[in-house]
């Protein structure tokens, strides 16, 4: 009897880094927490998570500035650790996250890590909200970040880092970073989670109007990089990243998602895997995968998106 290709793909995924294995167990194999949580607990002890933590200094930083030197800065190192699934409450992550509240919190309630202008940076504020929520840092200042983001939501439902400079149309990039922060806040049982769900719904509609990657006026592809799946996505939007958010939020079926789902299916290889299609230029401590080669990260995310899609259709 021939083996099921999907089973072969899952076995291949399980031979990857521990950061992938625990998510495969949770999201694709539907294993109980008693099985995948011990695997997740290893993320900071071996593999990519441990390698990244070794570059952190005693102050909790990866670089002197919180944001400079993409992608080895403290900001993007923490964002990657969240993607890897470093467990909530990890002391090294908690120490680093608090630096943003102690050193980069402005009077407007948001985070500014560049100080090149006086207004807080919406995209980074969304990232930091996600970090504080994922790592279960219940500092009361977290609510200031949330308030800032809710106040920055634009009329079309999304967000744009340049709103204070006159932008009137939301940014795909900023919106997905904020949405991930709001989602982590809800998952962390934040006290304003009902209000946050309403904001999420408005922002999902912004993406749906655009089919996640098209102009709402012409229907043409807004940016070809939106159709090329990267990991880590850094601050960039692409179709797979944002579909994975829709999955994580357990969004309802909407026919406007048929288009981006078809794009994901089109990119599946004959062996049931997905390639790494894009890498955002910048310095890294190490590379996890190679562009043009089969990607466990993209395969994991695509499969769990498709599982969600099959469930809600």
Predicted segments — roles?
Residues 1-313:
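Preference for long, amphipathic alpha-helical scaffolds in soluble/luminal domains
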């Amino acid at each position: 009897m021939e083996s099921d290709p999907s089973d072969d793909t899952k076995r291949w995924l399980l031979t990857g880094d521990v950061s992938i294995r625990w998510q495969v167990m949770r999201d694709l194999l539907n294993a109980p927490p008693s099985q995948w949580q011990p695997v997740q607990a290893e993320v900071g002890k071996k593999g990519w998570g441990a390698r990244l933590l070794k570059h952190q200094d005693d102050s909790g930083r990866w670089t002197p500035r919180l944001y400079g030197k993409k992608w080895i800065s403290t900001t993007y190192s923490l964002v990657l650790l969240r993607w890897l699934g470093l467990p909530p409450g990890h002391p090294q992550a908690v120490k680093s996250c608090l630096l943003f509240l102690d050193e980069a919190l402005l009077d407007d309630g948001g985070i500014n890590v560049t100080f090149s202008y006086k207004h807080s940076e919406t995209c980074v504020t969304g990232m930091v909200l996600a970090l504080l929520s994922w790592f279960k840092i219940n500092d009361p200042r977290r609510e200031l970040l949330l308030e800032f983001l809710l106040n920055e939501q634009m009329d079309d439902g999304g967000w744009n880092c340049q709103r204070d400079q006159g932008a009137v149309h939301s940014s795909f990039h900023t919106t997905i970073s904020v949405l991930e922060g709001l989602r982590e806040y809800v998952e962390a049982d934040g006290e304003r989670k009902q209000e946050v769900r309403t904001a999420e719904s408005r922002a999902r509609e912004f993406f749906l109007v655009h089919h996640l990657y098209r102009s709402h006026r012409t229907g043409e592809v807004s940016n070809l990089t939106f159709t090329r799946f990267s990991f880590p996505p850094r601050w960039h939007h692409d179709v797979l990243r944002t579909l994975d958010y829709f999955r994580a939020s357990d969004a309802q079926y909407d026919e406007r998602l048929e288009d981006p789902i078809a794009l994901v299916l089109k990119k599946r290889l004959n062996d049931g895997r997905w390639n790494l299609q894009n890498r955002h230029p910048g310095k890294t401590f190490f590379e996890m995968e190679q562009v043009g080669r089969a990607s466990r990260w993209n395969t994991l995310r695509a499969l769990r998106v498709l599982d969600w899609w099959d469930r809600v259709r």
